[in-house]
């Protein structure tokens, strides 16, 4: 079937030749019918020989010219086609040379842009790490504040700044996340408690507590740093859109998979917004005047969850709250997925 495709392509590209040769032969036959001095038998012989030789010529040309395009169809690298001299006709060589020059130029641009992106990533990473020093010093100064009301307000703003810096750092590292992962069995409860501790200043100001209920063995096979980032972003959203209601956090076992749920009783997500919650920079259409949301939290979560093998479920009702469920994979599922990725890279 594939050969028939190439035959059809070849005949279509040579259709003007074929029509011209047929026209010339029909013209000779027409002249022989008008002019009786032309021996009709000899002319039929010449026309038959001419058409036969033309057929042989087309077959030989087909095998010679289609060979290069079959290499293209097999997705062979242009470098291999050029260096192995697989182009046979002058026009084919010219085409291959042109493609080689263009692809080489584009590859150089890609390498240059990748270097610029790496430098940009390194610059932002260094900036975030550098600014963490005065932010940490600021925390020490805030701890010395004796006015509790003022201290609480300052800690609230400090927690927001610290959270935004961490988010920016993770955004910068998104491109290199696969190289930055190390899988091991870690305690889900320990990660959740550590993240709750980081958000305690915000939750205290907003009058929000945490009801934690871990019913099953909470050890999961994951990367602790990126998994904590996911939990942090979900907790941050729950705190941001809730007031004076506790956030419920717990684990369940579904088909041998540990699942973590985080349930808030905030304003919820509308049905029209639900399909877009993972888009970069998307914020709720219900509160366009709100400036505290960057729309990056769930985008980060969605960008990382597949690498961790986590299945994410979000359910929400406007005015009643949102439940986010993280379903963690088994170890053999992670190993199998990583093996597939490794095979694809080769």
UniProtKB/Swiss-Prot annotation:
It is an enzyme of class 2 (transferase). Disruption phenotype: Deletion leads to complete loss of resistance towards host cationic antimicrobial peptides (CAPs). Residues 126-332 form the Histidine kinase domain. It is a multi-pass membrane protein. One of its GO terms (cellular component) is plasma membrane. Keywords: Antibiotic resistance, ATP-binding, Cell membrane, Kinase, Membrane, Nucleotide-binding, Transferase, Transmembrane, Transmembrane helix, Two-component regulatory system, Virulence. GO terms for molecular function: ATP binding; phosphoprotein phosphatase activity; phosphorelay sensor kinase activity. Pfam families: HATPase_c. It catalyses: ATP + protein L-histidine = ADP + protein N-phospho-L-histidine. Interacts with GraX. This is Sensor protein kinase GraS. It comes from Staphylococcus aureus (strain MW2).
